[in-house]
Amino acid sequence: FLFAEVTNEQIAETFRILLTNKFQALSDLGRDQENNLDTYEHFWEKSKTAWNGACEEVLGRRKCQDKPWISENSIKKIEERKKVKETVNRAKTRQQKQAAQQIYHEAHKEARTSIRNDKRAYAEEMARMGEEAAAKGNMRELYEITRKLAGKWKATSGSIRDQAGSLLTTQQDQAKRWAEYFETLLNQPPPTGKPNIPAATEDLDISCDKPTRAEIKKAIKALKSGKSAGPDNIPPEALKHSMEESTELLHSLFEKIWQEGDVPKEWKEGYIVKIPKKGDLHECSNYRGISLLSVPGKVLNRIILERITLAADHRLTEQQAGFRKHRSCSDQITTLRIIIEQSREWNSSLYVNFIDFEKAFDSIDREVLWAIMRHYGIPEKIVSIIKNTYVGATCRVIHGGQLSEPFEVKTGGRQGCLLTPFLFLMVVDWVMRKVTEGKKTGIQWSLWGEQLEDLDFADDLALLSHTHQHMQEKTRRLEQIAATTGLRINRAKTKVMRMICKSTQPITLNTGIIEEVSSFTYLGSVVSIDGGTEADIKARLNKATVAFRMLDNIWKAKSLSKRTKIRIFNSNVKSVLLYGSETWRTTKALSKKVQVFINKRLRRILGINWQDRVTNEELWARAGQNSAEDTIRGRKWTWIGHTIRRGQGCIARQALKWT
């Protein structure tokens, strides 16, 4: 839908009035028992029709799907130019043709100017989004933004191979194969022996009342604009641009859902979009799937998530930093670097086992998940509602503009669901508690005998030990206990680092020996056994070079101002270069390498060559930059300030004083 049009206040008001009228009609119908709106399913169907109807009537649909940044105003000007061109072609006399060509020249000029303005606005918006992603440390989103700006999306292969390796050429066969692939991927084998997990003796202080209007409004505001709609075709903007009306409607709907303890069937359905990765695009395994779920359903999930995290977050261990407020990858990377550096300084043996789980989010047994939620004190009412959103959940794959046959998903967290990350954290937390319960197999962390067993970021686990025996014991216990929840360790991607160790025996799993390495890319940063950061800086320089080259068309574009180009450089190139720089141990030589890279790229963007005799200081002033050394130092002090303001139990804060 054309939600860019609601920036026009008159259109926005028309949209809200139409929605109000439709919702009022729905409310009047609800008072008529014959219309059977007393169930959440019927009420939802009528509500969906109201939203879609208002969007269709007032806004209409986009005509230019391949270039979404082109505004409706530009599309109108392009159509006007096309009509004028037809007039030129139909002209019968030279005089008529000259007059028509003059009009066409003006129409062409207006269309080009409008498109150029759209492109500038789009680049500015992408730069803003890139800055936000960089500030959050979300490198995946930043990479996707870079690819959009570069305009170099991989074309998905028309033909794919079946399990036997034969090419499938018909769309029907391909859709069937895609459904078969994702059905296998999203339905992992159950654990051989499920654990007996007792429920908490007392529930956490989590409200089990129906969602309030304030909660609904807050959840709607948290929705990200520009995201795709789910099976119900209701985009986030439909709710955000009719805040009061949507809040009232969802309040009535959620009340019915809360009473009956279940959600509409359509909310249990997901549409899978295929995103190509590296490698042979004829192979299904070289794609990842993104599930599109109902946006109103996400509002309910957001409310439940807020209630759960507010009460249950403190139950998680301090070692876990994934998907939690005021914690980041930098905390874990810095802590691990300090541990390695101090171990070398004190000539202390150290084992680090970087664990990788195979299809982690998709493999958790759901019955175990419900039991763990009750074990952590989540009230039965909340668990029941979440459970019912999973019961009967199905997916369909979008292929060639068509949908595959639906298939049921019976294991793991739902892809695209806001609740999945935190539910996964509880499972990993329970597993690690069982692994380390009553054990002292970690590294000495205090003078009072306290030990640090592991560093966790969601499913990225780094097990720590001083001896081979302790690391081997802990690894085997993790393998066994994780298996009871459905989690399986991927031996091929699990790696061990050791330093100053007398034993040469390998660390093993039931499936074989774990490979030993001298460096490992941990949470995006290269960690080496020598404790240095030179390898990481080299890797960041290579990644930043690739990012800069991908945006070559941006640097050459005459329609974009230098200010916009500098913003894009800062958000999409410089942030890639300086990712994790607050954890670096820099020298003058390493700082110079980083500065040379930045200077060279800034000179190209600003069109400055060596003959212009522009000093580096003047270059930085023109580009609004500080030196690389000052920037890195500032990032370090920002992280240190943030860390020391946290509680005494913070692992990263303790690491600053650990020796």
Where are these regions (language model features)?
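Short, conserved catalytic/metal-binding micro-motifs enriched in Asp/Glu and His
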Residues: 23, 27, 111, 182, ...
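Catalytic palm subdomain of template-directed nucleic-acid polymerases
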Residues: 359-376, 412-413, 455-485, 500-503, ...
